[in-house]
Amino acid sequence: MMTMFEEVEVEAYVYPTEDIRKVKKAMLNLIPGLQFEAFDKGEYVILVGRTKDKRALQRLYELFRGQQILDTARMMLEEGYFGEEIIIKVHKQVAYVGKVNFNEDSPLGPITITIRTKEPQKLMKWLAPRTKDGVPIE
């Protein structure tokens, strides 16, 4: 697979009731190979993971297909696309069990994934192509 992005950044707020290791696991379930930094804000910790690994999006690629959510994924990518960034928000607890859910209305806040890319259209087409009857057509 060719590299279509410069960096993937994943961010989540970790609240006192949460185990930071579980939040890290949830993030790594979607984007493997993240290097983490944590910023303590008192009320919560902001956990930020970054990677430039060219295989970073492979797991999302597989989940979008395995869960048969290509159309929804494409819509969310297009909605979150601004210039050279694509931003999507996913449900934290669902990510912990290794799945993607774009319903971000979780009481503990979403996981935010930012993809920095010079080729957003090409990346979206690869990650979540348009489909007809569930079959990719582009």
From Swiss-Prot:
<comment type="similarity">
    <text>Belongs to the UPF0201 family.</text>
</comment>
<dbReference type="Pfam" id="PF01877">
    <property type="entry name" value="RNA_binding"/>
</dbReference>
<protein>
    <recommendedName>
        <fullName>UPF0201 protein PH1010</fullName>
    </recommendedName>
</protein>
<dbReference type="InterPro" id="IPR002739">
    <property type="entry name" value="PAB1135-like"/>
</dbReference>
<dbReference type="InterPro" id="IPR022803">
    <property type="entry name" value="Ribosomal_uL5_dom_sf"/>
</dbReference>
